[in-house]
Amino acid sequence: MKEIISRHKAGEQIGICSVCSAHPLVIESALRFDLNSGNKVLIEATSNQVNQFGGYTGMKPADFRDFVYGIAQEVGFPRERLILGGDHLGPNCWQNEPAAAAMEKSVELIKAYVAAGFSKIHLDASMSCADDPTPLDPMVVARRAAVLCKAAEETANEEQKCHLTYVIGTEVPVPGGEASTIGSVHVTREVDAARTLETHQIAFRESGLEEALSRVIAIVVQPGVEFDHTQIIHYQPQAAQALSAWIKETPMVYEAHSTDYQTRQAYRALVRDHYAILKVGPALTFALREAIFALAQMENELISPEQRSRVLEVIDEVMLNEPGYWKKYYRPTWSQAMVDIHFSLSDRIRYYWPHPRIRQSVEKLIANLNNVTLPLGLISQFMPVQFERLSEGVLTPTPHNLIIDKIQDVLRAYRFGCTPDVA
């Protein structure tokens, strides 16, 4: 990470896409995408996804590391080009507890991530706990971040400290996605970004963390990009001009969250304007969902009814029977909720792919299509971009390859933004 930031600060139009997903096919797609490029790949876990209690994936930080390393080994991707990050590490999961208890758990969370070899750590203590006022005083946020930083510094060995980096600050949306429709997005004011940096500098120095300050590489801000279930707010460079100018005077860059679904040109403009770390998550699993849905349509054309996976029906049954991950986010009317379940840009379906019934039906779908030849016309009908790549000779038409390449469509847009010589 430090090398990428140094090159950006030296004037190079370079950034990095942060892959925020625990889905094995998404991780495989990212590693295969940069297998021969020489680029580093940044894969991040969030605190609610992976923590010392298992998170919603059931994985502790060391488990997630081993999970990613296992995929890297299968792909042949060298570990030294892998960067593991932890996102929103702090009291996020324990906001309903008193601050003292939540911070104790947050310290253990940080220790678990650093001990497991995660080298990019987002120190986020911005959320109010059960006995806190709302919003929290910025100095309280910074002092709590310093407590977390101290835990990281005490856990890391000397070799780890060579690679250890911190990200501070937070964006407006809560981690995990918008629960309501967005009308507009407030771009972070440069005075607020400056205050974030200043309060953290004071708090770190109070705690004797002068050396750790040199490891702070980025500040999370809102540059004016967001999406909800049905709409996207696209980057408007002129609205973020003052914010973009301020960071030039510091040794840091910005980290932008919720950059999913922006255009290729927007990613290039964001990196140019010093939002050099671009986080993406739902857009990757949305592409995965599109691929599964497309393959299901092909299956309907090629496989007899009694042999089909029924994957789309199984997804509906599971999500309607177990609505915990989508109910409070999607519209209450039945017909509208079904559209959201299938096609919402926030892609709450991503929480259901590990479900045993859904996983088995996806496996059957792929097995069914592996046993037949996929006609080019059928691929053109349901996956036209992949058909073009087949025609160019850069893709072979297996179900697995089609899924991977569909996910990589998203990564191609980020590469355009993050790599100066990509046309």
UniProtKB/Swiss-Prot annotation:
<dbReference type="Pfam" id="PF08013">
    <property type="entry name" value="GatZ_KbaZ-like"/>
</dbReference>
<comment type="pathway">
    <text>Carbohydrate metabolism; D-tagatose 6-phosphate degradation; D-glyceraldehyde 3-phosphate and glycerone phosphate from D-tagatose 6-phosphate: step 2/2.</text>
</comment>
<comment type="similarity">
    <text>Belongs to the GatZ/KbaZ family. GatZ subfamily.</text>
</comment>
<dbReference type="GO" id="GO:0005886">
    <property type="term" value="C:plasma membrane"/>
</dbReference>
<dbReference type="GO" id="GO:0019402">
    <property type="term" value="P:galactitol metabolic process"/>
</dbReference>
<protein>
    <recommendedName>
        <fullName>D-tagatose-1,6-bisphosphate aldolase subunit GatZ</fullName>
    </recommendedName>
</protein>
<dbReference type="InterPro" id="IPR050303">
    <property type="entry name" value="GatZ_KbaZ_carbometab"/>
</dbReference>
<dbReference type="GO" id="GO:2001059">
    <property type="term" value="P:D-tagatose 6-phosphate catabolic process"/>
</dbReference>
<dbReference type="GO" id="GO:0009401">
    <property type="term" value="P:phosphoenolpyruvate-dependent sugar phosphotransferase system"/>
</dbReference>
<keyword id="KW-0298">Galactitol metabolism</keyword>
<dbReference type="InterPro" id="IPR023436">
    <property type="entry name" value="TagBP_ald_GatZ"/>
</dbReference>
<comment type="subunit">
    <text>Forms a complex with GatY.</text>
</comment>
<comment type="function">
    <text>Component of the tagatose-1,6-bisphosphate aldolase GatYZ that is required for full activity and stability of the Y subunit. Could have a chaperone-like function for the proper and stable folding of GatY. When expressed alone, GatZ does not show any aldolase activity. Is involved in the catabolism of galactitol.</text>
</comment>
<dbReference type="InterPro" id="IPR013785">
    <property type="entry name" value="Aldolase_TIM"/>
</dbReference>
<dbReference type="InterPro" id="IPR012062">
    <property type="entry name" value="GatZ/KbaZ-like"/>
</dbReference>
